UniProtKB/Swiss-Prot annotation:
This is Small ribosomal subunit protein bS18. It comes from the Bacteria. GO terms for molecular function: small ribosomal subunit rRNA binding; structural constituent of ribosome. Belongs to the bacterial ribosomal protein bS18 family. InterPro entries: Ribosomal_bS18, Ribosomal_bS18_sf. The keyword Ribosomal protein applies. Binds as a heterodimer with protein bS6 to the central domain of the 16S rRNA, where it helps stabilize the platform of the 30S subunit.
């Protein structure tokens, strides 16, 4: 029997209501080296903020603030 660790949402702890797409340094923490969005089971963010993170990353990519992938192979 395994016990799951309680999720800890960093955005709830900071009382952030909205995740800004212009805050590139924060968004980079939630992107893998391959360019994929890190899942919430790894980051521990709640579902509400995970959706906001993915929307902000997609918008920042569209506006060329973030790359779609770091390495092209």
């Amino acid at each position: 029997m395994s016990f799951r660790r309680k999720k800890f949402c960093a955005f709830d702890a900071k009382n952030l209501q909205e995740i800004d797409y212009k805050d590139v340094n924060t968004l980079k923490d939630y992107i893998m080296e391959s360019g994929r969005v890190v899942p919430s089971r790894i980051t521990g963010t709640c579902a509400k903020h995970q959706r906001q993170i993915s929307r902000a990353i997609k918008l920042a990519r569209y506006l060329a603030l973030l790359p779609y992938c770091d390495t092209h192979q």
